[in-house]
UniProtKB/Swiss-Prot annotation:
This is Acetyl-coenzyme A carboxylase carboxyl transferase subunit beta. The lineage of its organism: Bacteria, Pseudomonadati, Pseudomonadota, Gammaproteobacteria, Moraxellales. Component of the acetyl coenzyme A carboxylase (ACC) complex. Biotin carboxylase (BC) catalyzes the carboxylation of biotin on its carrier protein (BCCP) and then the CO(2) group is transferred by the transcarboxylase to acetyl-CoA to form malonyl-CoA. Keywords: ATP-binding, Cytoplasm, Fatty acid biosynthesis, Fatty acid metabolism, Lipid biosynthesis, Lipid metabolism, Metal-binding, Nucleotide-binding, Transferase, Zinc, Zinc-finger. InterPro entries: AcCoA_carboxyl_beta (IPR034733), Acetyl_CoA_COase_Trfase_b_su (IPR000438), ClpP/crotonase-like_dom_sf (IPR029045), COA_CT_N (IPR011762). A zinc finger (C4-type) spans 59-81.
Length: 317
């Protein structure tokens, strides 16, 4: 009986089966555990195509590619390395204000009294900047509400000729200060500039004195003025309106100074190591009051203004 059972049962041929598996698995040159799940290639291709077609931005710090939708949702902060990317002036002000009630200074237009020409005429540079930014000048001024507070706020757009300060920027800032003074509401300025606009010569340098005088009138009247230093702030803007606030906030790692780092190194003949001229360096040396992450900036500004304006029941810690 045992012999019959042995005869009728067939022992598995291990060699033949393994050969068969190997042959089946290698139809596409892969072993069985390397074969892709059916349909996954099509899914990945569709996802990659969607990413490639959606407008994206490369982080200047970690070089990650971020979709513009994700970047806007995250307030232009890189989700991978927390680097603060630039924001346009209008985006920044609309982000700050809960309700925009109006805009100031649109009637001012730049003139070219010097007929200044460098590699191209000044009017041509202005036209290019206006086309690039869809703005008429480097400073935008809005007024409205930050929660329950009426405020006037302005922001530099670094994309517009490096956020340089010319006569129109000075006119708009002075008008913002006068509006804040007349309504007795706080003024908040987001600074991002390379300095005075060389194409306007002495007219641009004169704006340093004009803006400083306007800020002094606010100080005498007891109207709060807060400056937020973003990346970068240099030159005549640093030497005037950007350093005359009642409170100075700065975004992380923002470059802030008068002359550039390389200019200083050539003058003193020394190598200046990081974090020289960074916001954190200035905080350590008492130049700025606080370095604030962009995600906490609105809450911080509101708490400070609420304290300065004596708004009750606000935690200012």
């Amino acid at each position: 009986m045992a012999n019959n059972m042995t005869d009728t049962m067939t022992k598995p041929d291990i060699n033949n089966d393994s050969t068969s598996l190997q042959q089946n698995g290698n139809k596409a040159g892969q072993s069985w555990f390397e074969r892709p799940i059916p349909g996954i290639k099509q899914q990945l291709t569709a996802q990659l195509t969607a990413v490639e077609t959606e407008p994206s931005t490369k982080c200047s710090s970690c070089h990650s590619i971020i979709t513009n939708t994700a970047l806007i949702f995250n307030c232009y902060v890189c989700p991978h390395c927390d680097h603060h990317l630039p924001m346009s002036a209008r985006e920044r002000l609309n982000w700050l204000l809960d309700q925009v009630e109006g805009e100031l200074g649109q009637e001012f237009t730049a003139k070219d009294p010097l007929k200044f020409v460098d590699s191209k005429p000044y009017p041509s540079r202005m036209a290019e900047a206006q086309e690039k930014t869809k703005e008429s000048e480097a400073l935008i001024v809005l007024y409205g509400k930050l929660r329950n507070l009426d405020i006037v706020t302005c922001a530099f757009d670094f994309r517009f000729m490096g956020g340089s300060m010319g006569s129109v920027v000075g006119d708009r800032f002075v008008q913002a200060a006068e509006k804040a003074l007349a309504d007795r509401v706080p003024l908040v300025c987001f600074a991002a500039s390379g300095g005075a606009r060389m194409q306007e010569g002495l007219l641009s340098l004169m704006q340093m004195a004009r803006t400083a005088a306007a800020i002094e009138r606010l100080r005498i009247a007891g109207v709060p003025y807060i400056v937020v230093l973003t990346n970068p702030v240099y030159g005549g803007v640093t030497a005037s309106l950007a350093m005359l606030g009642d409170i100075h906030l700065a975004e992380p790692k923002a470059m802030i100074g008068f002359a550039g780092k390389r200019v200083i190194e050539q003058t003193v003949r020394e190598t200046l190591e990081e974090p020289f001229q960074r916001a954190e360096f200035l905080l350590e040396h008492g130049v700025v009051d606080e370095v604030v992450h962009r995600h906490q900036m609105i809450d911080t500004i509101y708490r400070l203004l609420a304290k300065l304006c004596s708004v009750p029941n606000v935690d200012v810690q």
